[in-house]
Amino acid sequence: LHHSKHHATYVKGANDAVAKLEEARAKEDHSAILLNEKNLAFNLAGHVNHTIWWKNLSPNGGDKPTGELAAAIDEAFGSFDKFRAQFHAAATTVQGSGWAALGWDTLGNKLLIFQVYDHQTNFPLGIIPLLLLDMWEHAFYLQYKNVKVDFAKAFWNVVNWDD
């Protein structure tokens, strides 16, 4: 359901926005251009975030990262447990719809955790997303009802650190 309906809707929305954007540009309709750029940003971000998230998940996941990522987490957060606690807090305190994100700051050359509102708001430029957790209700409600804390805890059992 999540992949076939929600994710597919973002792909369709992005494709529709591209077509409408081309039409608006041909007509030099600047109001429509701005509206469709906004719609494209939202839907394309929804598609990209879900694409990353699916790769972040594995039925054989869990445990902890190794190698460079483990070292970078220890350097940025002090330990894996501190990283996990901060990421969990970011996920469980998203107000409304959004994501928890671990990203690589290409300017500061370090890992950062932040909340993403909707799909793209509060997502800093220059960040490469590495680990995402979908905190929209559609991601957890069928299985976890309104207990998003349990969903965020269970996430650690399926994180694909090999990705």
UniProtKB/Swiss-Prot annotation:
Enzyme class: oxidoreductase
Pfam families registered for this protein in UniProt: Sod_Fe_C, Sod_Fe_N
Binding site for Mn(2+): H2, H50, D134, H138
Molecular function GO terms recorded: metal ion binding; superoxide dismutase activity
Keyword ATP-binding annotated: no
Reactions that this protein is recorded to catalyse: 2 superoxide + 2 H(+) = H2O2 + O2
Keywords: Manganese, Metal-binding, Oxidoreductase
Cofactor note: Binds 1 Mn(2+) ion per subunit.
Cofactor(s), names only, from the UniProt record: Mn(2+)
EC number(s) from the headed UniProt entry: 1.15.1.1
Role description: Destroys superoxide anion radicals which are normally produced within the cells and which are toxic to biological systems.
The family this protein is said to belong to: Belongs to the iron/manganese superoxide dismutase family.
Protein name: Superoxide dismutase [Mn]
